[in-house]
Amino acid sequence: MSYLIKPKGYKALLDLKQTELGIKQIKDFFQQNLSSELRLRRVTAPLFVLKGMGINDDLNGVERAVSFPIKDLGDAQAEVVHSLAKWKRLTLAEYNIEPGYGIYTDMNAIRADEELGNLHSLYVDQWDWERSITAEQRTVDFLKQIVTRIYSAMRRTEYMVCEMYPQIKPFLPHDIHFIHAEELMQKYPDLSPKEREHAITKEYGAVFIIGIGCELSNGEKHDNRAPDYDDYSTIDPSTNLPGLNGDLLVWDAILDRSVELSSMGIRVDKEALLRQLVLSGQEHRKELYFHKRLLDGSLPLCIGGGIGQSRLCMLYLQKAHIGEIQASIWPEEMRRECAEWGMQLI
């Protein structure tokens, strides 16, 4: 079911031409900074992959992929990607990327089951990145180091935007706050996971929640994760809590809520994959191409994630609807209401 937040007194700070220029400047500047911070080289990525190889991502495990038959391959089914987490790991192996270096790509996807609204579109564009690591770097401390570098690139980009458009004021705090999903649940035991995100992000401005996908002490998960990319089950000795992954959120004063900008994490090794397949009841995946490659040791240890391009632009340019940043399909009633409210959808 679609939703629409209509911010009181909303007025776009940039017109259409300024917005288009701003989008280009943000994308060029941020990806250059991301590449420099994490030592990533750009690679070309697929829009679709063959079905049944375990390469496409299942996200929360329930979304349907857009698919179509390929005539020249005997009507074999191809799927439009959800994201490229597993494809990137295969590419690290193919390019023989050493620890300390990685890849990034412009990822375009279609998520047909998305609930449409201010922050959610059928069309997804993000920087998908992946970096080879050593076994010693599979820790929460290393995860935090990478998150901090990404956040530094975000703050530099914000400075550039505010210099280009003085009517836009900076909003990101100097530092990002880290908290485990278990600690967050203990802090706000009476709130739902989404309400906890809003509460903690409003307090700190920018937050990274660790351990997305692991079972908390109340028997629930903060959110679901597919079992075969992020490692959400390994216990970190420094915290004695499970999970080497998480979500990066910032506070959006326009929409008066938290916004997830990135989902990322240290990826499963052989032991974590086997454990998470058992926990999720999906041991049959061991027979898929990607999973066989991981289990036979031919894929590198890595860390990676995705960073939403349209959401990042939306926040920097202080827009109220993601449709002010990207071209997509929206319910006619939503288009009408947005026009009445000053949200000019592309």
Q: Which residue ranges define each predicted feature?
A:
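A glycine-rich phosphate-binding loop feature that marks nucleotide/adenosyl-phosphate handling sites
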Residues: L47-K51, P166-P173, I212, E333-R335
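Generic structural hydrophobic/aromatic packing signal, biased to beta-strands
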Residues: I23-I26, F30, L34, F68, ...
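Extended, charged alpha-beta segments that form solvent-exposed binding/catalytic grooves
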Residues: T105-A199
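A generic secondary-structure signal for well-formed alpha-helical elements
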Residues: L34-R41, I150-V161, A320
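Class II aminoacyl-tRNA synthetase-like tRNA-binding/catalytic domains
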Residues: S2-H120, D128-S132
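Generic recognition of stable, solvent-exposed alpha-helical segments in well-folded globular domains
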Residues: L21-Q25, F29, R138-Q145, R149, ...
